[in-house]
Amino acid sequence: FGSNPGGMLTRAVRKGDRYVLNGEKMWITNGSLADVCVVWAKTEDGVIRGFLVEKGTKGLKAWDLHGKWSLRASVTSGLAMTDCEIPAENILPKAEGLKGPLGCLTQARYGIGWGGVGAAMACYDTALQYAKTRTQFNNRPIASHQLVQDKLVWMITEISKGQLLALHVGRLKDRGRADFSQISMLKMNNVWMALETARKARDVLGANGIVDDYCIMRHMNNLESVYTYEGTHDIHRLIIGERITGIPAYF
């Protein structure tokens, strides 16, 4: 349900030893490929619970979304459940309320923080090598130009800061001390950093930056999606804002 998961419309109604699910989900990774789906739905008392729905269950329909300019190597699907009956034992026993799905998001956001570093490094390395070998104006490498060096320095500085942030949060996580707002900061900062790095790297390569001989446009297109999924950039700013002020500003 976008940035308002608490407003989800999918419902699960108890029927004897079974639950009946009705609703739709969009933008589900590998939804049409998965043998088992984890579906979050509101029960009759309005509490969000998690359910395991197996592929082939009557009433479950999955379809793929096409025409994407981003995440083209990933299968993205929609799911629809129409009077979809599953055994009551398929409920996740310890997942109750928003804590369940948001806990999953927190884990994913941590991984994305590192993924942003990897994408940024690929773009930086490409731009650096290109700048050192591409020559112009009396056969000089464009890396000798002040403005090109400025872009390269910006990239490696921001990447290094992102690496340190990811390492710090990772160490806190290993000790069980990582706060969800710190993980929001990691995801927010490192995806922004990676997207800006991709844009600057594309600029260094000029027209060559848009062709598939180089990885930059692929990373840039994918990062446009990562900027939004697992919590939008702006939502993460609000999460951090509430943490430091104690005042929620979502509405």
PLM regions: where:
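A gly/ser-rich beta-alpha-beta helix-loop segment of oxidoreductase catalytic cores
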Residues: F1-R14
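Short, solvent-exposed loop/turn segments at the edges of secondary structure
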Residues: P5-G7, L33-A34, G46, S74-T76, ...
